[in-house]
Amino acid sequence: SLHAPSALVLTVGHGESAATAVPLRAVTLTCAPTASGTHPATVSACAELRGAGGDFDALAADAGVMCTREYAPVVVTVDGVWQGRRLSYERTFANECVKNAGSSSVFTF
């Protein structure tokens, strides 16, 4: 195929690290050749990831969202392949609101 594969599994769980957090939800996100998967916003999430060059730390936070300072940590993991390269990512957010505001759509699941 002309497109290198981009297929990811994203999970979210309560806790400070993926080693101890039990996954509450898991979604799939495939971005090539077309956007698909169980992620609730495949097209926008793929567009956002392409814009960030597949760098999850480069995703822009949604500036319009105000979150409480409550500390109820959630951890997001991403594993799979992005444009043919293996990828494994983990990030902890202070709470669910902060997670959802951490990107436009990638972490909103």
From Swiss-Prot:
Membership in a protein family:
Belongs to the protease inhibitor I16 (SSI) family.
State the organism of origin: Streptomyces ambofaciens
* Gene Ontology terms: cellular component: extracellular region
Record's protein name: Subtilisin inhibitor-like protein 7
Q: Where is this site: Reactive bond?
A: 69-70
Query: Per its UniProt record, what InterPro entries does this chain match?
Result: Prot_inh_I16_SSI (IPR000691), Prot_inh_SSI_I16_CS (IPR020054), Subtilisin_inhibitor (IPR023549), Subtilisin_inhibitor-like_sf (IPR036819)
Q: List the disulfide bonds.
A: 31-46, 67-97
What quaternary arrangement does the UniProt entry report?
Homodimer.
Role played: Strong inhibitory activity toward subtilisin BPN' and, to a lesser extent, toward trypsin.
Q: Which domain of life is it from?
A: Bacteria
Please give the chief subcellular localization of this protein: secreted
